[in-house]
Curated annotation (Swiss-Prot):
Residues 491-518, 918-1047 are annotated as: Disordered. It holds the Pfam family SPT16_C. Interacts with MYOG (via C-terminal region). Component of the FACT complex, a stable heterodimer of SSRP1 and SUPT16H. Also a component of a CK2-SPT16-SSRP1 complex which forms following UV irradiation, composed of SSRP1, SUPT16H, CSNK2A1, CSNK2A2 and CSNK2B. Interacts with NEK9. Binds to histone H2A-H2B. Identified in a centromere complex containing histones H2A, H2B and H4, and at least CENPA, CENPB, CENPC, CENPT, CENPN, HJURP, SUPT16H, SSRP1 and RSF1. Interacts with GTF2E2. One of its GO terms (cellular component) is nucleus. CDD domains: CDC68-like. ADP-ribosylated. ADP-ribosylation by PARP1 is induced by genotoxic stress and correlates with dissociation of FACT from chromatin. The modification Phosphothreonine is found at residue 903. Residues 985-1005 have a biased composition (Basic and acidic residues). The modification N6-acetyllysine is found at residues 139, 196, 223, 513, 732, 786, 904. This is FACT complex subunit SPT16.
């Protein structure tokens, strides 16, 4: 494939070069032609000549001479390079419409016949303007015969040479959008390598107290850029280091980029690291100082350095002189810390682009160039030869601080930092515990174990008043959150007050709009039951009149044979009858008179002359009504699923074959009855899953609320889970949770297999599984990184924090619930569990009692019409970690010993929100003595007294009787398979009656104990968990009184 040249970019840039030359400013004013020659030298990394070539053509062209005259451009190169340059030479009239001069191409020969080509170029120089002065890059000297002969030819003619390095650098310093994108990418790769490799490696070295040489660590950083996981999706062949990484510590510091990492061992003090990565010829730079146990003075100096960088960023604006930027920073040093004036670096940074360091754009006191929008600088500030007064060893006494970033000059406001690596003390400081502190802690622990509570109480008395325990800090923060919670809820309800709720239009079930549309069948005339399948109507004789009933009005039917007769009983829906969860209110006029049931009787005996028995009509009617009813309910269910579905944009397919793609994945929920494998591919605006049989599921990026990546650590599957903003339809159902997963290892274990701990097959299988896990994790991570790069990080995948996870039962089975940065999730079990933290109003812990091993967690949403979420059976050991996590997320939590009837509580709030907040709002959940209206605690007793001990039956009743439609989309209802038979209630069975008797006995025993302890409990000090009303009713899991307190 031929190498292509970006013609538009070439014409744009050569026009800019000529435009600046013709303006005649600075060195441009005196030159008649520009001569640029590039030879072959592997040791030269940065040169103006090669930078100009890369800027114009996108590539370096060795052994090439470029002569820019006033009215023409001449390129002399090898035959292959001339073919490449023909892409810009062969234009209409050999001159670009933008006014770029015509191009002449000369082929370089390998023998001495180049003289004629040299003469042509010399003649062109002489004809350009005055033909005496030529602009050259005086520092660029390339070896080789070709370069020497050309240099001799120029010297022979006696042209005056003017160094134009600075003015050309200023011309190409302003970056176009394409160049800025490359520099941003280079900066992001540098940040990735620093964060994910270097910083982590230094932490490991410090933690393990390893001895590692600076040079070895620098080499490992260079090797890291060969691994794709640190390159943010970039091709490794396009990435290289700008210079070998510079790592310094232990008193030997030189804050320049020309030094090399020495072979000394890393000292755990101030560790400076400078690294720069080049992406597609464009450079970036990053400098950070990692500090191990910094003293207060070191931290103060470091914070002052950050302050200076902020000042520098503010001054880097379009139109400001570079020397003014430098002077303003120096003024801050003189005013605030003049003793550091001789310690600061001589310059504060330099321009950067294709060349790492642009010598003419150094930020110092002498540079008169003005900054322009689109310029990119590497800003580097540091203090060297600082003295650590607390240092004892020679390497501890002297330290240096050095920070640097790649920044972009904007038109207004401070410069934009492209290397987004955090640099505050808390981010770069590594704080270790002293051995003495650790010994003291161990001694305290031992003392507690030996002496028990007496010693603990003695140690607690030593605490000063200013010290606060974690629990006290949490409580203080929770009080602040409680005040904010009620205020925000009031404001939110006030805003929503004016919003009208859209009432759903009821579907009309009129079979025939007028009598003429009724069918004229013999069955109807013969006063038999007839089913009109087309209009889904049952026509029955009522008082001798054929009366149509739509299938939607029929609740159920039953048929029975008694003696010589067959009975067909038809039950209808009517006001007052129990409706199923999915039926809703289907009566447009509930005040009308309704038929509740009709029973028909027919003889089983054949009359003389009749071919069939009369009961055959009832038998056929029973069968056909069942069929029509089933078809109608199935269709209604499908229509209900489609209700409220937001129409999605069409997926824009990316025809590029290098799209991020994952193969051999399963989808949940299944598209068909049987699970099928397929592939997930990222396109321009969304994902497409294609199964092996061709089914397609599209998920758009803008419809994804949470994108979760659940690694396979400790799990049997590896999952990509998408929680959607609006439901999507596939498999005839709507889904707000879609996930793609693959299994890791064997889900089942052969228990009959003979196992031995040293069995080679087992060891090999374990090794294979480990490798498979690693391979899958790498594949998924690469996919995620590519997708994030493709979407410009608009879509970010969250990884659950397994360390913060806790067990609970949000549905029927217990699973591990794990927080992410914005949600609480479980993606490995099905149905999945996802709660968005931004939508949560507060969390309430129920059944928190000393003698119970677990408790329940209730999640109340900001949308009060939404059903609360219950997580049952959470181990008590998880209570404090959950509180700590919720507190860190600024979420209000409360706790109590009782189980509350949340359906009634939420209905009370929705019916009268103003009254609810006037009575103190959510403070009724606070334990006695802590709520803001504790003294008026009895005023809310109406709500609090609605407590009960929930059993499975209670939860079912809540769901049935709820006025709100709380049905979750994750739940799969099987109402299409509901029995259509008689709904006669059956009596309670023996097990239920025995259970009720046991409960009655237990409650009577508790009431006796309660009477004895009530007088004592009033005298005790009120604590978080003491509640007179709930003490006997909440303790349904234990018959024994509490024996010990939980810490």
């Amino acid at each position: 494939m031929a190498v292509t040249l970006d013609k538009d970019a070439y014409y744009r840039r050569v026009k800019r070069l000529y435009s600046n030359w013709r303006k005649g400013e600075d060195e441009y004013a005196s030159i008649d032609a520009i001569v640029v020659s590039v030879g072959v030298d592997e040791e030269i990394v940065y040169a103006k000549s090669t930078a100009l070539q890369t800027w114009l053509f996108g590539y370096e062209l060795t052994d090439t001479i470029m002569v820019f005259c006033d009215d023409k451009i001449i390129f002399m190169a090898s035959k292959k390079k001339v073919e490449f340059l023909k892409q810009i030479a062969n234009t209409k009239g050999n001159e670009n419409a933008n006014g770029a001069p015509a191009i002449t191409l000369l082929v370089r020969e390998k023998n001495e016949s180049n003289k004629s080509s040299f003469d042509k170029m010399i003649d062109a120089i002489k004809e350009s303007k005055s033909g005496k002065k030529i602009g050259v890059f005086s520092k660029d000297k390339f070896p080789g015969e070709f370069m020497k002969s050309w240099s001799d030819c120029l010297n022979k003619e006696g042209f005056d040479k003017v160094d134009i390095s600075a003015v050309v650098a200023y011309t190409i310093a302003v970056k176009e959008d394409g160049e800025l994108n490359l520099m941003k990418k280079a900066a992001s790769i540098t940040s990735e390598v620093f964060n994910k490799f270097f910083k982590e490696r230094v932490m490991e070295i410090v933690d393990a107290d390893e001895k590692v040489r600076h040079s070895k660590l620098a080499e490992s950083v260079e090797k890291a850029i060969e691994e794709k996981k640190y390159l943010a999706g970039a091709d490794p062949s396009t990435v290289e280091m700008c210079y070998p990484p510079i790592i310094q510590s232990g008193g030997n510091y030189n804050l320049k980029f020309s030094v090399v990492s020495d072979k000394n061992h890393m000292h755990f003090g101030a560790i400076t690291c400078a690294m720069g990565i080049r992406f597609k010829s464009y450079c970036s730079n990053l400098v950070r100082t990692l500090m191990v146990d910094p003293t207060q003075e070191v931290q103060e100096n470091y914070n002052f350095l950050l302050q200076l960088q902020e000042e520098l960023l503010k001054e880097l604006r379009h139109g400001v002189k570079i020397c003014d930027v430098y002077n303003s920073v120096m003024d801050v040093v003189k005013k605030q810390k003049p003793e550091l004036l001789n310690k600061i670096t001589k310059n504060l940074g330099f321009g950067m682009g294709i060349e790492f360091r642009e010598g003419s754009l150094v930020i110092n006191s002498k540079n008169q160039y003005k900054l322009k929008k689109g310029m990119v600088f590497s800003i580097n500030l540091g203090f060297s030869d600082l003295t650590n007064k607390e240092g004892k060893k020679p390497e501890e006494k002297t330290y240096a601080l050095f920070i640097g970033d790649t920044v972009l000059v904007d038109e207004d406001g401070p410069a934009t930092i492209l290397t987004s690596v955090k640099k505050k003390v808390k981010n770069v400081g590594i704080f270790l515990k002293n051995e003495d502190d650790e010994e003291e802690e161990e001694e305290k622990d031992e003392a507690e174990d030996l002496l028990g509570r007496g010693s603990r109480a003695a140690l607690l008395t030593e605490r000063t008043r200013n010290e606060m325990t974690a629990e006290e800090k949490r409580r203080a923060h929770q009080k602040e959150l409680a005040a904010q919670l009620n205020e925000e809820a009031k404001r939110r309800l006030t805003e929503q007050k004016g919003e009208q709720q859209i009432q759903k239009a009821r579907k009309s079930n009129v079979s025939y709009k007028n009598p003429s549309l009724m069918p004229k069948e013999p069955h109807i005339r013969e006063m038999k039951i007839y089913i009109d399948k087309k209009y889904e109507t049952v026509i029955m004789p009522v008082f001798g009149i054929a009366t149509p009933f739509h299938i939607a009005t029929i609740k159920n039917i039953s048929m029975s044979v008694e003696g010589d007769y067959t009975y067909l009983r038809i039950n209808f829906y009517c006001p007052g009858s129990a409706l199923g969860r999915n039926e809703g209110n289907i009566f447009p006029n509930p005040e009308a008179t309704f038929v509740k049931e009709i029973t028909y009787r027919a003889s089983n005996m054949k009359a003389p002359g009749e071919q069939t028995v009369p009961a055959l009509n009832l038998q056929n009617a029973f069968r056909i009504i069942k069929e029509v009813q089933k078809r109608y309910k199935t269709r209604e269910a499908e229509e209900k699923e489609k209700e409220g579905i937001v129409k999605q944009d069409s997926l824009v397919i990316n025809l590029n074959r290098s799209n991020p793609k994952l193969k051999d994945l399963y989808i949940r929920p299944n598209i068909a009855q049987k699970r099928m494998q397929g592939s997930l591919e990222a396109h321009v605006n969304g994902f497409r899953f294609t199964s092996v049989r061709g089914d397609k599921v599209d998920i758009l990026y803008n419809n994804i609320k949470h994108a979760l990546f659940q690694p396979c650590d400790g799990e049997m599957i590896i999952v990509l889970h998408f929680h959607l903003k609006n439901a999507v339809m596939f498999g005839k159902k709507r889904h707000t949770d879609v996930q793609f997963y693959t299994e890791v290892g064997e889900i089942t274990t052969d228990l009959g297999k003979h196992q031995h701990m040293h069995d080679r097959d087992d060891l090999y299988a374990e090794q294979m599984e480990r490798e498979m896990r690693h391979k899958l994790k790498t594949a998924f991570k690469n996919f995620i990184e590519k997708v994030e790069a493709l979407t410009k990080e608009e879509l970010e995948f969250e990884v659950p924090f397994r360390d913060l996870g806790f067990n609970g039962a949000p549905y029927r089975s217990t699973c591990l619930l794990q927080p992410t940065s914005s949600a609480l999730v479980n993606a490995t079990e099905w149905p999945p569990f996802v709660v968005t933290l931004d939508e949560v109003e507060l969390i309430h812990f129920e059944r928190v009692q000393f003698h119970l091993k677990n408790f329940d967690m209730v999640i109340v949403y900001k949308d009060y019409s939404k059903k609360v979420t219950m997580i049952n059976a959470i181990p008590v050991a998880s209570l404090d970690p959950i509180k700590e996590w919720l507190n860190s997320c600024d979420l209000k939590y409360t706790e109590g010993v009782q189980s509350l009837n949340w359906t009634k509580i939420m209905k009370t709030i929705v019916d009268d929100p103003e009254g609810f907040f006037e009575q103190g709002g959510w403070s009724f959940l606070e334990p006695e003595g802590e709520g803001s209206d504790a003294e008026d605690g009895d005023s809310e007793s109406e709500i609090e007294d609605e407590t009960f001990n929930p059993s499975e039956d209670d939860y079912e009743e809540e769901e049935e009787d709820s006025d709100e439609d709380y049905s979750s989309e994750a739940e799969e209802s099987d109402y299409s398979k509901e029995s259509l038979g008689s709904e006669e209630e059956s009596g309670k069975d023996w097990d239920e009656l025995e259970e009720e008797a046991r409960k009655a006995d237990r409650e009577s025993r508790y009431e006796e104990e309660e009477e004895q302890s009530r007088s004592m409990s009033r005298k005790r000090k009120a604590s978080v968990h003491s509640s007179g009303r709930g003490s006997n009713r909440g303790s349904r899991h234990s018959s024994a009184p509490p024996k010990k307190k939980r810490k």
